[in-house]
């Protein structure tokens, strides 16, 4: 806990300007242009005062040079500001692309379990909202920052040159408003953290509500999921209201003080007194009024910028928390497996945020190359965890996992993935054509090979029956297809990869009875010559496996083939009996019980 807090603390102090290093030159150029625009806008005011002085001295003459200076400075100010914002926006787009690319590459290098713990809402917020927040800062704030700094400094210098007394009066108003603003900011730092946390929860609730819509409408008309979303939204609104109560008055009061009107009032009142006693020139007084009120107007964006900077710092903190997450360890000198055997050696593992105990406890087994191994057991026994660890979902807490005698941690990720193809129960299809979904990982595969893989996976017939065949585009996550159809497409995808190890996690979970036998036969042909790890709840799938591993409570309890395990009379035998009873179950009892009741 302490290391995590210290890491967060160090990230919170991460220099804001260091983040923009890839686009620093463009940002500096944009700020320089904005600073020059601020100076030329002051020049326009000075030329205007010069024009008033000449008109007062010689009313019949037109002050051509001063008026020309006003027009020239106004045009130059417009051009410089336009170029400043163009430059800063191009820099922001470039930085946004860099950060999203870095985050995407980081996500590919993180253990999948870490991303699952973060949740889709958190990941989406970092890659979308937080990066967008940094884009807004670079695009809009950096030129305003330059103007908000350069213009007041230059104005103060000119005011002291005109009259030090009025300059001090102007500084007094700005100092008072700034103190109030700082106090308001201190009160809002903790609330800003709570605000972003609440917004993250709303984002996660929205994603869950939309993705689970078909399920929740079927079972509870969406009331439970909507209630979760409603509570997240209410908490977010509550944070906003609390934030407004704590810092609202101070923020509004500072806005009022730093408004040009209070400064203008002070300068009119004090300047009139000086003018009345003859210690001040009227034209100089006009210059002070124009410059002083303009300085207050230039400082106004600083208040909004301070809030934006605070929000940007939080976004940067979250971005760099993701970028600082530990990646899967990769070897400096890689070892290549020479064959497709699988070995688990005293492997223990627990899910970091799980409330239960360890998912696997000192599991050891060896699978020779080319064997079909089935993993069975009650729900939560650790079967899917074995499959996920084989894919480096995470590294085990203890022990070693080897392919071909090589520890997974001694392989590069690409090398490991070239050994494995897999089909999970929770399949995923992209919004693309069916052919491209099957080609995933091998985009240059000819259509003939795609069709061949689909035939083996028993998917060709239903694909051919679609209006556009293999060019049919599937919806988000494959929503336009049935569960069984999606599963067969993912099986075809795995078969097309033609890798020596095949991992199946409930690959036939969505197969209807008509196609289950054909699918099992097709898979048997596809498994030939490969090492297969098959997680199964349907025990009919495992009877022909070379070895069956039975798990219970995270431990490997029994090992053997179907006949051997039945002969042992242990947990597998009881599971098989329950499975057989379930297969013969009809409403009113098993088929035998129904027949016996009818005889009576």
Residue ranges of model-derived segments:
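Transmembrane helix-loop-helix hairpins at lipid-water interfaces of multipass membrane proteins
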Residues: 21-80, 160-165, 282
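ABC ATPase nucleotide-binding domain helical subdomain, centered on the C-loop/LSGGQ "ABC signature"
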Residues: 101, 400-402, 410, 417, ...
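Helix-to-loop junction immediately C-terminal to a conserved catalytic motif
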Residues: 391
